[in-house]
Swiss-Prot record:
Record Pfam families: Complex1_30kDa
Family per record: Belongs to the complex I 30 kDa subunit family.
GO cellular component term, pick one: plasma membrane
Its biological purpose: NDH-1 shuttles electrons from NADH, via FMN and iron-sulfur (Fe-S) centers, to quinones in the respiratory chain. The immediate electron acceptor for the enzyme in this species is believed to be a menaquinone. Couples the redox reaction to proton translocation (for every two electrons transferred, four hydrogen ions are translocated across the cytoplasmic membrane), and thus conserves the redox energy in a proton gradient.
Protein name per its UniProtKB record: NADH-quinone oxidoreductase subunit C
Reactions mediated catalytically: a quinone + NADH + 5 H(+)(in) = a quinol + NAD(+) + 4 H(+)(out)
Organism expressing this protein natively: Moorella thermoacetica (strain ATCC 39073 / JCM 9320)
Keyword Transport: yes
PANTHER family referenced in this protein's UniProt entry, alphabetically: NADH DEHYDROGENASE [UBIQUINONE] IRON-SULFUR PROTEIN 3, MITOCHONDRIAL (PTHR10884:SF14), NADH DEHYDROGENASE UBIQUINONE IRON-SULFUR PROTEIN 3 (PTHR10884)
Assembly and oligomerization: NDH-1 is composed of 14 different subunits. Subunits NuoB, C, D, E, F, and G constitute the peripheral sector of the complex.
Highest classification ranks of the organism: Bacteria, Bacillati, Bacillota, Clostridia, Moorellales
Length: 148
């Protein structure tokens, strides 16, 4: 995997590599995500988007998108991370590469407020359409019937 990562670093000079407990994590700027993911899928065999999620770091004013990719033929796994501005979290949609990203991106939009330009139908998926806020953000406050 070392040669593979070195090749990616040559193609994407802003790519940061972090060793993980289980798999390496590639940290890439949001404007390079689509190009990196296209490379990983079309040229490196990572044909399966296992999942994506968002993590809220309010103390750092960022939301981190985390993607887990699998190469089924190559029996390999890799993690890709993107740090987003917490006030305006936005990262390109991956639905054109992996149609399964559709529902997962809608969930991240609904629960964390991340926008995905290029998504074919970005709208709430779990909360009602008139719901205010994003309930998985750490600063989200529940209101009781008494208003507290």
């Amino acid at each position: 995997m070392d040669n593979f990562i070195q090749e990616l670093q040559r193609l994407f000079p802003d790519l940061e590599v972090r060793e993980g407990v289980d798999v390496p994590a590639l940290v890439v700027p949001a404007d390079q995500l689509l190009a990196l993911m296209t490379e990983l899928k079309e040229k490196r065999g990572f044909n399966f988007l296992a999942d994506l999620t968002a993590v809220d770091y309010p103390e750092d004013e960022r939301i981190e998108m985390v993607y887990h990719l699998l190469s089924v033929p190559g029996m390999a796994e890799i993690r890709v991370k993107v740090n987003l501005d917490r006030q305006h979290p936005e990262v390109p949609s991956l639905t054109a590469l992996w149609p399964a990203a559709n529902v997962q991106e809608r969930e991240a939009f609904d629960l964390m407020g991340v926008k995905f330009p290029g998504h074919p139908d970005l709208k709430r998926i779990l909360c009602p359409d008139d719901f205010v806020g994003h309930p998985l953000r750490k600063d989200f406050r529940l209101q009781t019937e008494g208003g507290e």
